[in-house]
A protein has these predicted regions:
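Generic beta-sheet signal
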Residues: 54, 78, 109, 134-136, ...
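Cofactor-binding loop segments of dinucleotide-utilizing enzymes, especially the Rossmann-like FAD-
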Residues: 8-11, 56, 111, 136-137
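Conserved core of the sugar-phosphate nucleotidyltransferase
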Residues: 115-169
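Short glycine-/acidic-enriched loop or helix-start segments at secondary-structure transitions
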Residues: 17-18, 62-65, 117-120, 143
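Short beta-strand-to-loop acidic/aromatic patch adjacent to the donor-nucleotide binding site
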Residues: 102-114
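Conserved N-terminal catalytic core of the sugar/cofactor nucleotidyltransferase
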Residues: 2-8, 15-17, 29, 33-105
Length: 169
């Protein structure tokens, strides 16, 4: 089964620009010589995976082409916005349907998180499931700095509601 990793980067990054950062959020260094984007990609290196990047490529000004323009990458250009990653997916839905066919494994990763996992364990966990969302439950320490985040409410392991860029408190 072919796998796809979708990385929505449609935001304008103004929170970081306003704080004086010159580097787009996804390309900020997080560990030694690796940035957030490279860290996300490395979590999927054992899979036969195609990567779909959703962004406003004019905003990126060709500064990150060495990361973006690769053989297994699909680039979907959207307008910049401040409505969150799910809105980026919404704007890209037509192109996503052209790239992804039925019954293919899809991972979606925001660019403001960093994690590591054993992809073999993940594959066993997601086997025979249509949709799995990896997230944390309840309060997370990063919310002390900025309480705006994306949330979902669940009942019996089913998502009942999703909200983006809302306050936890």
């Amino acid at each position: 089964m072919k796998s796809f990793l979708i990385i929505p980067m449609g935001g304008s990054g103004t929170r970081f620009v306003d704080k004086g950062y010159k580097t787009y959020k996804a390309f900020l260094p997080v560990d030694k010589n690796i940035n957030i984007f490279e860290g996300i990609i490395s979590n999927f290196k054992k899979l036969d995976i195609e990567i779909i990047i959703i962004a406003n490529f004019k905003t990126l000004n060709n500064r990150y082409n060495k990361y973006l323009k690769k053989n297994n990458h699909h680039l979907i250009d959207i307008k910049s916005h401040k409505k969150g990653p799910v809105y980026s997916l919404f704007l890209a839905q037509k192109k996503l349907r052209e790239i992804i066919k039925d019954n293919e494994q899809i991972f979606i990763s925001y660019t403001d998180i960093n994690w590591s996992w054993n992809i073999n364990h993940v594959n066993r966990f997601v086997k025979n499931k249509k949709i799995v969302i990896f997230t944390h439950e309840n309060f997370h320490p990063h919310l002390e700095i900025n309480s705006k985040s994306d949330f979902c409410t669940t009942r019996k392991n089913l998502i009942k509601n999703i909200s983006e860029k809302k306050n936890y408190i």
